[in-house]
Regions:
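Conserved N-terminal beta1-alpha1 strand-loop-helix module at the mouth
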Residues: 1-80, 84-88, 95, 101-103, ...
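Short beta->alpha connector loops at strand-helix junctions that form conserved
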Residues: 82-84, 107, 129-130, 184-185
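Amphipathic, soluble alpha/beta structural segments
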Residues: 97-100, 105-108, 179, 184
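Active-site/ligand-binding-proximal alpha/beta "capping" segment
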Residues: 125-133, 137-180, 186-187
C-alpha cells in the first residue's frame, strides 16, 4: 500500500480487492533503518477494520522487537522481520507466532538463503526482496529470480516476492516458485482494479504454462 493514495486508503484497498488481491501488504519504515517514514499501528488497526483481507506487515525498522505486540494487537495477520537487523531473532519470531500472527523473514538482494537456514523451522514463510529496502517504485532486480529458485531448493515454506512486480515480472517469479507477490507502484499507476487483474492474470498464465494447460 506504499504507493496508494493515503487520503483514500480504505477505498484503494477495496479497488485492489475487486481486482483479485488476496491480502494487503504495507511497509513500516522508521526513518532510521531506511531513509523513509511511513505508518504505525494506529493506521494498521484502521486498515484491518476497513477490509476483510489479511494484512501483511514488513517491519523495516531498527528495533522491530518493540513493534511486534502493537502491530499484533492492531489485528494484522502476518509480520515480517529482517534477520540481519533483528536482535534475538528466534525470540522475536516466537513472539510473533505466540501473538497469533504468521512470522516471516526477509532476504534482501544482498542476503543469501543460507543465512536464514537455522530459523526456517520457526517461520511460516520467506520474503525475497526484488528491490532494495526503503522506497517504492524501484526497478526489478532480475537476479532475484534465481534466488527464489534457491530458496525453494532449501525449504518448503511459501515464498513471497516483494518489489518491482508488474505484469511482465510476475510470471518470472511464479515460474521460479513464488507463492505470493507484492505489487505496489504497478497497481496504483492507473486504475487499481484493472492493474491488479492484469498482474494476477499474468501470474496465472505462467502457472497454466508450467502445468501444460
Amino acid at each position: 500500500m506504499l504507493a496508494a493514495d493515503f487520503a483514500y486508503l480504505a477505498e484503494e484497498v477495496r479497488k485492489t480487492q475487486l481486482g483479485g488481491a488476496e491480502f494487503v501488504h504495507f511497509d513500516v519504515m522508521d526513518n532510521h533503518l531506511v531513509p523513509n517514514l511511513t505508518i504505525g499501528p494506529a493506521v494498521a488497526a484502521s486498515l484491518v477494520r476497513a477490509t476483510d483481507l489479511p494484512v501483511d506487515v514488513h517491519l523495516q525498522v531498527s528495533d522491530p522487537a518493540s513493534l511486534i505486540r502493537p502491530f499484533a494487537e492492531a489485528g494484522v495477520s502476518s509480520i515480517t522481520v529482517q534477520p540481519g537487523i533483528t536482535r534475538h531473532l528466534h525470540r522475536v519470531v516466537s513472539e510473533i507466532r505466540e501473538l497469533g500472527c504468521e512470522a516471516g523473514a526477509v532476504l534482501t538482494p544482498a542476503t543469501g538463503p543460507e543465512e536464514i537456514a537455522w530459523i526456517l523451522p520457526h517461520l511460516d514463510y520467506v520474503v525475497v526482496m526484488s528491490v532494495e529496502l526503503g522506497f517504492g517504485g524501484q526497478g526489478f532486480i532480475e537476479g532475484m529470480v534465481e534466488k527464489v529458485r534457491r530458496v525453494g531448493e532449501v525449504c518448503s515454506l511459501p515464498v513471497e516476492v516483494d518489489g518491482g512486480i508488474t505484469a511482465s515480472t510476475a510470471p518470472l517469479m511464479v515460474e521460479a516458485g513464488a507463492r505470493a507477490l507484492v505489487a505496489g507502484s504497478a497497481v496504483f499507476r492507473g486504475d487499481p482494479t484493472e492493474e491488479m487483474r492484469r498482474i494476477i492474470e499474468a501470474g496465472r498464465s505462467a502457472v497454466r504454462r508450467a502445468s501444460g494447460g
